[in-house]
């Protein structure tokens, strides 16, 4: 599909053709998000049984959770090079193959050390997918649907989480954690098949000097040949910078600003604290008075469904509401939710809680997750794919995605330690304070990029405009 050398004018395409191609690209690439979500969700239900099987301490439990994030940071760190050399399409293929290997290795682990290694391999795959899929979608989509297409990736992440929670709930009666982990290989095989039929990114093709192929792909994706030609001309204009990556980062202040903003955005996303709910939901609900594994898993499933439905709404609102309003509202909702959840858990610690506080705790986790799903979860990935200059996009997104996974690893590897050190209330109130701080950062620094082309954002950035104004 990407090695077409004949003149595309001999192959007229209808708007229906372009719509179908855009839908296929969106769905196929977003399956990478499904894999990501499956792994986030599955460990929450599997961890109690893994802990019993291997007799794990709290520290080892944290490492079973966070070893995946360590691998993801490694995968994201090297994926800039991989994506530049192989292209976005074949980077997704490599990630899918590694996902199969990591899933099978986790299911057949005979020691905690073997499980940790398999989880790291799985993490490398997730790191590749989390880097490549949003980048690929941002480069394939037109500016008016770019946010929607990238939000589809986040929707598939949440669908994966819900599917994992359903699987965990089903297997929780038998405690079969190996089946919980091994079943993840199946969607990875589906992704391998889908990637075969994906076209290469036109921006990557143009960067490699393959302009005829780039225009052919753009004609598949855009409503008219004129739009395809105009976009290719803009891409070629942005490629006139002679340097790229690290070399450009060292000498160009504006590039450094974009890279550091992407890193800050990803750190903000993780330090909202929402992923600790995904990783440790059964433990949180145990602290909130749900005594049986089945009760904890049902409450966890409710949170997962909330995440999925809120993300579904976000898919259709992110390109209408804008990036900044979504972030400001989302951080506010998460601040309130973690504040009240901390209060509820303090009452349970003091032994003064009523049964109603158990359900209020569930309600607050649902509120937090809904706020996250409609703001930081999709919007940060959208912004990070939008703000990087083309010649430095691989490097910039490598830096931001690596920051995401390092931050993710930190929150995953410290949650149980924080519970022991400052208690459940103190832990969630810490995240309340961070979310309040992020509201201020959004006002001060974050740009609005709704309905703006990537090339226009790049021109504003490189002209030295304030970061909050580069989307204007």
Swiss-Prot record:
Name the cystine pairs. Answer: none
User: Is Kinase included in the keywords of this UniProt record?
Assistant: no
Q: Name one Pfam family in it.
A: Sugar_tr
Q: Which PROSITE patterns does the record associate with it?
A: MFS, SUGAR_TRANSPORT_1, SUGAR_TRANSPORT_2
Reaction(s) this enzyme catalyzes, per UniProt: L-arabinose(in) + H(+)(in) = L-arabinose(out) + H(+)(out); D-fucose(in) + H(+)(in) = D-fucose(out) + H(+)(out)
- Periplasmic compartment residues: 51-63, 113-114, 176-178, 279-297, 347-361
Q: Primary place of residence?
A: membrane
CDD domains tied to this protein: MFS_GLUT_like
- The UniProt transmembrane annotation reads 30-50, 64-84, 92-112, 115-135, 155-175, 179-199, 258-278, 298-318, 326-346, 362-382, 405-425, 426-446
Coiled-coil intervals: none
Where is it located? Answer: Cell inner membrane
- The residues exposed to the Cytoplasmic compartment are 1-29, 85-91, 136-154, 200-257, 319-325, 383-404, 447-472
By its UniProt entry, which InterPro entries does this protein fall under?
Answer: MFS_dom (IPR020846), MFS_sugar_transport-like (IPR005828), MFS_trans_sf (IPR036259), Myo-inositol_Transporter (IPR050814), Sugar/inositol_transpt (IPR003663), Sugar_transporter_CS (IPR005829)
Q: Which GO terms describe its cellular component?
A: plasma membrane
| GO molecular function terms noted in the UniProt entry | symporter activity
Alphabetically sorted, this entry's keywords are:
Cell inner membrane, Cell membrane, Membrane, Sugar transport, Symport, Transmembrane, Transmembrane helix, Transport
Q: How does it sit in the membrane?
A: Multi-pass membrane protein
Describe its function: Uptake of L-arabinose across the cytoplasmic membrane with the concomitant transport of protons into the cell (symport system). D-fucose, a nonmetabolizable analog of L-arabinose, is also a good substrate.
Q: To which protein family does this belong?
A: Belongs to the major facilitator superfamily. Sugar transporter (TC 2.A.1.1) family.
Full protein name: Arabinose-proton symporter
Which gene produces this protein? araE
């Amino acid at each position: 599909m990407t090695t077409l050398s004949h003149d595309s004018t001999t192959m007229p395409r209808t708007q229906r053709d372009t719509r179908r191609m855009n839908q296929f690209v969106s769905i196929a690439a977003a399956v990478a998000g499904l894999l990501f979500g499956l792994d986030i969700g599955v460990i929450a239900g599997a961890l109690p049984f893994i802990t019993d099987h291997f007799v794990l301490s709290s520290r080892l439990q944290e490492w079973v959770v966070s070893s995946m994030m360590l691998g993801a940071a490694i995968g994201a760190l090297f994926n800039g090079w991989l994506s530049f050399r192989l292209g976005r399409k074949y980077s997704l293929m490599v990630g899918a193959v590694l996902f199969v290997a990591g899933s099978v290795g986790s299911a057949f682990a005979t020691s905690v050390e073997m499980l940790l290694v398999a989880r790291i391999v799985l993490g490398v795959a997730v790191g590749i997918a989390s880097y490549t899929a949003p980048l690929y979608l941002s480069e394939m989509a037109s500016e008016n649907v770019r946010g929607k297409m990238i939000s589809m990736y986040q929707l598939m992440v949440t669908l994966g989480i819900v599917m994992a929670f359903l699987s965990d709930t089903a297997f929780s009666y038998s405690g079969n954690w190996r089946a919980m982990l091994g079943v993840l290989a199946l969607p990875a095989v589906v992704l391998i098949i889908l990637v075969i039929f994906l076209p290469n990114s036109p921006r990557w093709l143009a960067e490699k000097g393959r302009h005829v192929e780039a225009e052919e792909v753009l004609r598949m994706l855009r409503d008219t040949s004129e739009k395809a030609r105009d976009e290719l001309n803009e891409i070629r204009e942005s490629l006139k910078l002679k340097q790229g990556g690290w070399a450009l980062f060292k000498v160009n202040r504006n590039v450094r600003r974009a890279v550091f903003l992407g890193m800050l955005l990803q750190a903000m996303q993780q330090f909202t604290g929402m992923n600790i709910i995904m990783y440790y939901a059964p433990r949180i609900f145990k602290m909130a008075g749900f005594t049986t594994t089945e009760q904890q898993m049902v409450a966890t499933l409710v949170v997962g469904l909330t995440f999925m439905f809120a993300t579904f709404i976000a898919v259709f609102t992110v390109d209408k509401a804008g990036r900044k309003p979504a972030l400001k509202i989302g951080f506010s909702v998460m601040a309130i939710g973690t504040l009240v959840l901390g209060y509820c858990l303090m009452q349970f610690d003091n032994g003064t809680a009523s049964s109603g506080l158990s359900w209020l705790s569930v309600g607050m986790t649902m509120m937090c997750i809904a706020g996250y799903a409609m703001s930081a979860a999709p919007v940060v990935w959208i912004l990070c794919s939008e703000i990087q200059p083309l010649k430095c996009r691989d490097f910039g997104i490598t830096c931001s995605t690596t920051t995401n996974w390092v931050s993710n690893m930190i929150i995953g590897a410290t949650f149980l330690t924080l519970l022991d050190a400052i208690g459940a209330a103190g832990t969630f109130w810490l995240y309340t304070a961070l979310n309040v701080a992020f509201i201020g950062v959004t006002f001060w620094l974050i740009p609005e990029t709704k309905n703006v082309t990537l090339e226009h954002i790049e021109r504003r950035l490189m002209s030295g405009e304030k970061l909050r104004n580069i989307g204007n």
